[in-house]
């Protein structure tokens, strides 16, 4: 049991109680710490996004590609929420929040690798944009999957509440250390797995979108007569 799950049950119980209107109920202790932690993590998340956006704009000199790269952060956050929902797990303001902030710096690497390969191919080739995107995806498919897979495999023992003590030569289950850090590992696994798959689907679509829009406009634009 976690403080968050116990608090939710207690809040549901309070709703069905006949409490006088002049009595205010406030939750302190762990709940107050959770609120403060969530505020801190939210501020850290916003600052990290702003710093990454500034760095990516200066590096790629392209606002649209910067937006595509940062879309991985949205995908990873959605993956975390979806994973918590599927496995009926509680959102920890501190550990899950730290995991989301950490993911912001991890998952953008896949998009950076893919878009950088696309830019390199585009600078050396005059092929159709779809052909260039397919080549970039073919070149970076294995690196993206390998880096994501190795990260997830390394975190699986901790996510399953296993801790390994190499000095004592022991493998413990549901220990204090593993229970405390399991939400962080689970958060990163959900975010990376969801983002890695959708990156190879959504990013190529977003890269081809400007050219596709231009084709549609040129197709329906009325011809001008002298």
Segment roles from a protein language model:
Residues 1, 32, 119, 151, ...:
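Short, glycine-/Ser/Thr-/acidic-enriched flexible segments
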Residues 12-15, 19, 43, 75-76, ...:
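Residue-level marker of structural boundaries
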Residues 54-140, 145-164, 172, 190, ...:
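Hydrophobic transmembrane alpha-helices and their membrane-interface caps
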